Every structure is written in C-alpha cells, then in structure tokens.
Amino acid sequence: MRRKKFVSMLLVATMAATLFAGCGNDSGKKGSSGGAKEFDAFFAVPGSEINDDNEIQKIIEEKTGVRVKETWLTGQTADEAVGTMIAGGEYPDFIDGISGQKQLYDAGALVPLDDYIEKYPNIKNLFTELEWEKLRQDDGHIYWIPQFSCIKGDEKVCTHNDEAFWIQARVLKWAGYPEIKTLDQYFDLIEKYNEANPTMADGTENIPYTILCEDWRYFCLENAPQFLDGYPNDGSCMVDPDTKKVLDYNTSDTAVEYFKKLNEEYNKGIVDPESFTQTYDEYISKLSTGRVLGMIDQWWDFAYTAGDAIKQAGLDEQGCDYIPVPVTIDGRDNQWHNAGGAFNASTGLAVTTSCDDVDAAMKFVNDLLDQDIHNLRYWGVKGTDYEVDENGEFYKTADERKKASDTAYKASHSCPYSYFPQYNGTSDDGINANKPDGQAREFYDGLNSDVKEVFDAYGVKTYVEMLGTNNAPGDWYPMWSFSNNFTTDTPGGAAWTKIGELKHAELPKVVMAKDFDSAWDTYMDKYNACNPQDFLGELQTELDKRLEQAAKFK
C-alpha cells in the first residue's frame, strides 16, 4: 500500500467549529439515543459547525455505536488553546493540537497507542513499518496517527493541495490563455487585466493581488522563494537533491528578487494594502466575493470555503475561480506537485489521559476506516449524494454536486469526521477514488464552467496537469514535519522562533518600503542576528538521520 499526504489542513474548511470552552470530558457516557458511547474531540484548527442531528453522523453512530462531538479552534492560537488545557489538566478524549502537539506530549497528556495500533488492523495497515517508526517519540512509543498521510492502493489525485500561484479564470480568458511561466509574466498579466477591467460586473473594484499573513499562515508571504526556485515544499528550507544539503531560501538571490517585485507591485497599487493586517476570515471573505485576481496560497487553505462560496453565488459565470500556474523566477521547471504526497510525522490524532475507554476510542478509529463507513464520510449516501453507473463507478448529478457545496446542507447532512484518519487513493472495489475529488470523471464533470474553459484551452483535465507531477523528492521529505515541532528548548528552535517573529514584523515593512534596498539590508542584518545557522544545522542533522533510518528499511 502506498500512502502519505498531509494535505495538512487540506480539509480545514469542511470541518466544524464551536467554542473551545465546549471541550469538557464526557467520555464513556451513554447518549440519550440508542445507548451510543459518546466521545469528544478538539482540533486546534478553525472550521464550521455541523448540526447535532446531522444525518450521516447518525448513520455512522448506528453502525459503530459511537458518536463524537467535535470542537474546533476559535479566538486563540493552537498553542494558546493547548496551553490552557494543560494548565487546567482537563482534556477531550481525542485531540490534535497541531503546533501544540509536542506540548501535550511533554505534559504527559497523551496515551501511548502502540498496543492499539497492533490490535486494530485498519489502523495498522495505514502505514509502512518505516512510517510507523518515524512516529516514535524519544521514549520509544507512538502517541498520534497522521490523518492525511495514507494513500490506499493506486493514487488518484486531481487537485493540487499544496502551494501555488493562483490566478482567476477570467484573467486567463481575457488574455487568450497565455503561457505564464515567470513571476514577471504573472504580475504583468494581473496589471494589464486590472487596467483594462478595474471592476467586476456589478461595479465592485477588483483587488489585483492579496497576501494572507495572519499567524502561522504567513507562509503565503514568506516561503515563496523556495517555490520560485522550483523546489518542492520542504517548508522550512530547500534541500539540494544531489548533495542532500539543507539550503536557506530566506537569503537566496531569488528571495531578493521576489520581495523586490512585491515591493514594486505594492507601490504601484497592485498589492492589497490590507494584506498585512487582514485576518484569515477577512481574506476568505475577499476571495469569496470574486474580487481578488491572484494570490499565493495552499489549496486546502481557501478552496473549501471561498471556492464553495464562489460556486453558490454563481461567480464562476464571471470567471472568478482560481487556477494554478507554474510560476518560477525564470521559467525553470517546478517540483511543486509530487506523486505519493508527504508523510507528516509532526502531529496527528491522539487520545488523551482524560479518556476513560481508550480501547473503545481506538476501535471507533478502526471502524471509521472500514470502506463502507469511509464511503459515507466522503461520498455520502447512495441515491442521495451520489449514484453508481453500470460499471460500478460513482458519480454525482448536477443537483448532488450543488448540494455538496451548500453550507447549510453540509451542516445538516455531511459528516466526514475530517480530522480522523482517512484514505486517499483507491477504494477496496478497485474502481473508485476514496474521495470525490480524486475521481477523474466526476472531478472533471463537476468543475465549474469557467475552470473547464481554462482546462480545455490548455489541454488538461486536472489542476495537477496545469503544474506537472514529479516523483517524491527523497527519504528526507518533507522537512516541515520536523520543523513544525521546533521548540525553544534547542538553539535551532530558539532561532526558528526568533526568525518567525522577525518575519512577521519586518517583511511587511520590506514590501511597503519606499527604499527597498535599504529595507532589505536592515531585514538581513536582523535575520542574521537570529543565528539561522542554528536551525539550519538542526535541520541538516534531522535530514541525515532520516536518510540513515530509511536505509535500514531498504
């Protein structure tokens, strides 16, 4: 079985959000309907609430004897939310603390899962022996299960869930579907389109280019240089595939060119002046109106919220959907999309010490991975959410597709348990994708008309084909699965924290500066004072360790 995929937050927007205060522990209590066992869960990411009488959740409850009340992050950072829990000593039954996961482990709040992994075959079969080994902590035990890192059977992928430069379909159509390969070409097209078409059909002014910078999502500003140099998403660094050495994208020639370009575009009025103060919700709201012509972001960060809103508002008819274009600094090939995804060992679903029936909790995780229940989670109910043709292939009608993007319908009907372990790839039937967005025919048939026009013009059928596919970079990949768990307990972690704080404070000033060269020099002086060699050194040590570990399993 092949696997992986951290779509990291690939399904952030399909999830539900209630107040963090709702995370009290009720594990083991019987529900009022049918005597189902009830657990609670907290995931340190934002989302949207589902209804208490959700229809598919009820079906899953009938099949498993369990229901889980999921709560999500609101009004705090992940680290703040986790810190509050640790201070109080009370936890939900299930948790994914995201950037706060290591805090939970260090606080002794998590239960070792080794015995349960061996007991329940669906869980055990998620990963290879090497991948399970990567999850062992310094005490030798496994405490969490990555949710998005399993590709079951043959890989089926149509979307690019990672980072890219995105541009609206209407811009490409207006220009006659040109080849966009460089950063200069990208911004030149946005400038020309906005000059010729400064407003939407209703007179609302376009926003040519916006940047999301809030909290951890400031990757939309700071890490573009690695992609512009054509590298895959190692997150905290670049890795030379030949020498296996860590490279610092923050100080590269491309970093200078990129931020200088942003500075020029800001001073031309192309970059949204609210970029550095807007919240994530405000950013999604802007995208949802169709006003934003382009941005850099990861698919999972906007597609399931803004994308659905664009469809529901009929803005696809104006060409407001987003298309990825393979922009690099000088037109070189990119390695953005990789076959096999990425294994994220830094966090995952954990069970806490507050859970009074760990075995039942883990049995539920195992049950959620039964194929029929997995189909309920991601395809829905046959005859209501999807149909089956004479060859056994799943598909949706136009009405079913419309319902699937409707917020109210999702709240009342859909229950993906989206931060529990799941499959990408191929169903046990050998025919269907485990999720609709991997089903090639259904994916293409369900595209908005403006996206279809773009794909037809470029001779492609998927977002992936717009960018190209590459083999997995190497056994070290991805390095962000290490740096995500940096703490200030090590020199490298302390340097990483200082650099993050510096970027938040100084990179907006660089972009807005009247004198770019002076602002960049000041930023570099401050950057070097953070001792980046410490975090780069720890990254190199981890990279070497991963290569050595992988060699033992070959």
Q: Where do the language-model regions lie?
A:
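Carboxylate/His-rich catalytic cores and anion/metal-binding grooves
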Residues: 108-136, 190-194, 204-239, 244, ...
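Positively charged n-region of N-terminal signal peptides that target proteins for export
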Residues: 1-6
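Helix-loop-helix "hinge/cap" segment bordering the ligand-binding cleft or interdomain interface
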Residues: 141, 146-219, 240-286, 291, ...
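Conserved N-terminal structural module of periplasmic/extracytoplasmic solute-binding proteins
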Residues: 8, 23-185, 197, 223, ...
